[in-house]
Regions:
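FIC/Doc superfamily catalytic core
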Residues: 1-232
Length: 232
C-alpha cells in the first residue's frame, strides 16, 4: 500500500493537533474505558465529570501526556527504548510496572491467543524487520501498530502504546495520523481478534489504511495551517 498523504512537518503537526481530542479518546477506548468524546474533552479542559471513574480519568490524562511527548519528540530515534518511554506515560499508575517489558504471562480477553513472555532481542528484531522493509511509511506504521499490539510487550496499555508508536512513525515522515473512529471500533476489535489468532496482517491492515489514516486536503487548509494555533 502506498502512502495516503505527503505532508510537511507543520502540516502533519497541525493535523495531529486538530485531532488531539479524538486521538486521546480513541486511545482511551482502546484501554476499555467507558467514556464519551464530550466527557473526554471536558476532562482535558480541567472540569470534573460526574460518574466518570478515577481510573478512566487517569487513562485520559496519561494519553494526553503521551501524545504531548510524541509531538515534542518527533525527531527522536524510534526504537524499543522509545516505545518503553511511551508505555511509561500510557500505563503510569495503571499497571504492575510501566515502561518495561513484562516478565510474566498475560491473557487477552475475547481470544484464545496467549502471547508469550517478550524476549528483548526478539522484540528488537521484530521492530527492525518492519522498519527496514521496502514498503511505504504508512505500511510500516500499520504493521508496527499490529506487531506491538499482538506482542503484548507490557503488562498494560499495549494497544495504546502501539497506536502512539505508529503515529510517531507517521508524523515524523509527514504521512498523516492514525486514529480509529469510534463508530468503527467494534469492527476494528473483531478484526484485531482475528489478527491476534492468525498473525495474518491482511485480516486488518487494509481496513486500518482505508478508515483510520487521516491527513489534510492541501487546497482547503493551506492558509489555515500557517495561521491557526491549537493549544494542547
Amino acid at each position: 500500500m502506498k502512502d495516503k498523504y505527503s505532508l510537511s512537518r507543520a502540516e502533519n503537526i497541525f493535523v495531529a493537533k486538530k485531532l488531539f481530542y479524538e486521538a486521546i479518546h480513541c486511545g482511551a477506548k482502546l484501554g476499555d474505558t467507558n467514556i464519551t468524546l464530550p466527557e473526554t474533552m471536558t476532562i482535558l479542559n480541567g472540569v470534573n465529570v460526574p460518574n466518570v471513574t478515577i481510573d478512566d480519568i487517569q487513562t485520559i490524562l496519561n494519553m494526553r501526556d503521551a501524545w504531548r511527548y510524541v509531538l515534542k519528540s518527533v525527531d527522536d530515534t524510534f526504537d524499543l527504548n522509545y516505545i518503553c518511554s511511551l508505555n511509561s506515560y500510557v500505563s503510569r499508575n495503571e499497571s504492575i510496572e510501566w515502561g518495561v517489558l513484562r516478565k510474566g504471562n498475560v491473557g487477552i480477553g475475547g481470544t484464545n491467543f496467549k502471547p508469550k513472555i517478550p524476549v528483548e532481542s526478539e522484540i528488537k528484531n521484530g521492530i527492525d524487520d518492519i522498519l527496514t522493509q521496502d514498503i511505504s511509511v504508512t505500511d510500516k506504521a500499520i504493521k508496527l501498530f499490529l506487531f506491538i499490539a499482538r506482542s503484548q510487550m507490557f503488562w498494560d496499555g499495549n494497544k495504546r502504546t502501539s497506536l502512539l508508536s505508529a503515529n510517531k512513525i507517521l508524523i515524523s515522515q509527514g504521512k498523516g495520523v492514525l486514529v480509529i473512529p469510534e463508530k468503527i471500533l467494534n469492527d476494528f476489535h473483531i478484526r484485531l481478534t482475528d489478527f491476534y489468532e492468525s498473525n495474518d496482517y491482511t485480516k486488518i491492515d487494509s481496513f486500518l489504511y482505508e478508515n483510520c489514516i487521516h491527513g489534510i486536503d492541501y487546497e482547503q487548509v493551506e492558509e489555515q495551517v500557517e495561521n491557526e494555533e491549537i493549544d494542547i
